[in-house]
Amino acid sequence: MTDLSHLARPGAEIAVRVTPRASRNAVILDGEAIRVTVTTVPEDGKANAAVVKLLAKALGVAKSRLVLVRGATARDKLFRID
């Protein structure tokens, strides 16, 4: 698991690129970009819930502190840490 704890400050906005239906769950730091792959399907918010869980673990914050600002139905998402 990629450690992103250095990004976990209140008010920080984190852009991620999501790949649903992947072969495994992972958070990948690719240069400046953060990519999250999840095995779940993008139906009824299941993939978003999996992304929040993985991203919160990588950031070392509670899931409740992550707020999806933009991209609920898109692959490019923007999260804010409260």
From Swiss-Prot:
Gene3D superfamilies: YggU-like (3.30.1200.10). GO terms for cellular component: cytoplasm. InterPro entries: DUF167 (IPR003746), YggU-like_sf (IPR036591). Pfam families: DUF167. NCBIfam families: DUF167 family protein. Belongs to the UPF0235 family. This is UPF0235 protein Pden_2174. It comes from Paracoccus denitrificans (strain Pd 1222).
